[in-house]
């Protein structure tokens, strides 16, 4: 690590994110430029842990909203993510880079892992904001982000990597998703107190990353064996229980079918035309022993027993709250 007794020279500061194109799914328009900007947080995101809310409409506290630390415009094509050992990066503002490099050179105590809270107070974090005109989703794992300071001394180069910012927190609450949108006319007046029933509009609004909808690709069993009969097919989901939570799960969840473009094509039904639901099963003696059970036998048999020739028909379902304006 360089110090004030050395003549190391600052080069750059980068925010690096790993991306393995073979395991990630890019959704949307990957043929046009998509723009992403990085900002520094001025304070922690406002959060009331005593009265947590599903949505927090507080303004995100940024150091300089009019001046991003970095701007990256890219086409989200596979070759973009297969270079440099499946890593891509934002080159951040040099003023911030020199500020952090100064901490490194004087070996400031806030860089000691034992003083993690001091560093969090000094450097609240970074946020990546997609442009409002973006038409694609870029899945970035916040736990894999790394902040790197690059420097050199003569012909020798060096890199100082800060701990992942989420690692400074004692829980995953520090990694968060900020969603901003302008609702269409149809949904402009919808709120928790003024919902729009699913049955009225026959529409479901999906918000990924918030736990409302789960897309599931079902395993495929070929129908090439005419002597095999599928008697029962069920999906069993076990809610993850946190000790500090006391929020009751809904008693039912609903299942939707998707087309090959991942668009909702309708509600899943059985052979009698009845909607298929998942029902919450609880154990009064063991609070943590609870699960949703969804019977999809009719659907599965209809998909794999009609002469697919052993070709996987891509069985995708969407599971979410039953008829709620999410």
Identify the role of each PLM range.
Residues 1-326:
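Secreted, disulfide-rich extracellular signaling modules
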């Amino acid at each position: 690590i360089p110090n004030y007794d050395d003549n190391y020279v600052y080069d750059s500061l980068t925010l690096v994110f790993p991306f393995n194109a073979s395991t990630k799914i890019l959704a949307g328009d990957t043929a046009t430029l998509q723009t992403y900007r990085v900002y520094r947080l001025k304070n922690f995101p406002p959060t009331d842990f005593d009265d947590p809310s599903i949505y927090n409409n507080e303004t995100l506290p940024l150091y300089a909203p009019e001046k991003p630390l970095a701007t990256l415009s890219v086409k989200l094509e596979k070759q973009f993510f297969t270079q440099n050992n499946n890593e891509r990066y934002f080159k951040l503002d040099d003023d911030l880079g020199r500020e952090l490099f100064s901490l490194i050179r004087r070996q400031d105590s806030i860089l000691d892992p034992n003083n993690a809270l001091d560093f969090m107070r000094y450097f609240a974090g970074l946020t990546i904001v997609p442009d409002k005109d973006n038409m694609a989703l870029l899945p970035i794992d916040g736990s894999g982000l790394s902040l790197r300071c690059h420097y050199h001394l003569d012909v020798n180069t060096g890199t100082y990597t800060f701990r992942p910012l989420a690692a400074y927190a004692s829980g995953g609450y520090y990694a968060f998703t900020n969603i901003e949108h302008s609702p269409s006319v149809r949904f402009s007046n919808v709120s928790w107190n003024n919902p729009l029933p699913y049955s009225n509009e026959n529409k479901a609004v999906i918000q990924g990353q918030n736990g409302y909808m789960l897309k599931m690709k079902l395993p495929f069993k070929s129908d090439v064996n005419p002597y095999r009969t599928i008697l029962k097919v069920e999906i069993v989901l076990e809610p993850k229980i946190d000790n500090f939570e006391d929020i009751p799960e809904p008693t039912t969840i609903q299942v939707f079918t998707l087309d090959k473009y991942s668009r909702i094509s309708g509600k899943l039904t059985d052979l009698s035309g009845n909607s298929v639901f998942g029902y919450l099963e609880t154990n009064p003696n063991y609070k943590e022993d609870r699960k949703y059970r969804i019977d999809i036998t009719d659907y599965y048999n209809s998909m794999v027993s009609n002469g697919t020739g052993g070709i996987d028909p891509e069985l995708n379902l969407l599971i979410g709250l039953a008829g709620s304006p999410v």
